[in-house]
Amino acid sequence: MAKKSIVNRNIKRMEIVNKYATRRSELIAVLKDTKSDIEQKSTARNLLQGLPRNSSPVRLRQRCILTGRPRGVYKKFGLGRIKLREIAMRGEIPGVIKASW
């Protein structure tokens, strides 16, 4: 089980990323646009650097929603590999069965 402070930090980062997502995407679009001049790009870069560091989605970490485990997390379910197996074996995830060949 991960420390609650680390899990809460990641949740807080998710909220900040969602809050600034549109603003960040607009600024990045200006930077990638070939038609915008140097002045527009420099102001966009300065505004982008002025955004909070935690507003970047790169700083997020996929974690298991039950245990907070940072590695071995399946995005589709939001669960770590261990909890996914436990829940799937109990038949609580519809459509998931144990492979047999």
From Swiss-Prot:
Q: How does it assemble?
A: Part of the 30S ribosomal subunit. Contacts proteins S3 and S10.
Task: Identify this protein by name.
Answer: Small ribosomal subunit protein uS14
* GO MF term list: rRNA binding; structural constituent of ribosome
- A family per Pfam: Ribosomal_S14
Q: Name one GO cellular component term.
A: small ribosomal subunit
Name the lineage: Bacteria, Pseudomonadati, Pseudomonadota, Betaproteobacteria, Nitrosomonadales
Q: Origin organism of this chain? A: Nitrosomonas eutropha (strain DSM 101675 / C91 / Nm57)
Q: Which family does it belong to?
A: Belongs to the universal ribosomal protein uS14 family.
Its biological purpose? Binds 16S rRNA, required for the assembly of 30S particles and may also be responsible for determining the conformation of the 16S rRNA at the A site.
Superkingdom of the source species: Bacteria
Q: Ribosomal protein among the record's keywords?
A: yes
State which residue ranges cross the membrane: none
Entry keyword set: Ribonucleoprotein, Ribosomal protein, RNA-binding, rRNA-binding
| GO BP field | translation
Cross-referenced HAMAP family, in alphabetical order? Ribosomal_uS14_1
